Amino acid sequence: MLMPKRTKFRRQMRGRMKGKAKGGKEIAFGEFGLQALEPAWINSRQIEAARIALTRYIKRGGKVWVKIFPDKPVTQKPAETRMGGGKGSPEFWAAVVKPGRILFEVAGVPKETAREAMRLASHKLPIKTKFVEREEMGGDANES
């Protein structure tokens, strides 16, 4: 599973997930992508489950890029523990995802295969997503 090799501090504040994604909104490597429509924490197990669903459906044909990384430690205190006694121990790692963020990218497969693979992967995630295609840059259409 994905997690940082080392961090400066073991615990982090929860923070707020307001606004839209600042970066990672365009497809950078592949031809098709899966875009988040809601804010959420996506933990490393969910990312891995979605990645496996994608790669199993695509088989050997295409290439998959995971565009998010779980770099936020999420702490939990043990069950039935009294309040106080400090912050809990880190239990899992999460990626902070805001609306508009590209989560996965795929290349080297037909559009329908990519769409179905992304649909299967989206069922493993706790947020609503949409299938997006790369928009080609360049002004070919307006040349006279």
UniProtKB/Swiss-Prot annotation:
Q: What cellular component terms from Gene Ontology apply here? A: cytosolic large ribosomal subunit
The UniProt entry's GO biological process terms, in alphabetical order, are: translation
Q: Name one GO molecular function term.
A: structural constituent of ribosome
Task: Name the CDD domains on file.
Answer: Ribosomal_L16_L10e
Q: InterPro entries this protein is in?
A: Ribosomal_uL16, Ribosomal_uL16_bact-type, Ribosomal_uL16_CS, Ribosomal_uL16_dom, Ribosomal_uL16_sf
Keywords, alphabetical:
Ribonucleoprotein, Ribosomal protein, RNA-binding, rRNA-binding, tRNA-binding
Give the family per the record: Belongs to the universal ribosomal protein uL16 family.
Could you tell me what this protein does?
A: Binds 23S rRNA and is also seen to make contacts with the A and possibly P site tRNAs.
Q: How does it assemble?
A: Part of the 50S ribosomal subunit.
Q: What is this protein called?
A: Large ribosomal subunit protein uL16
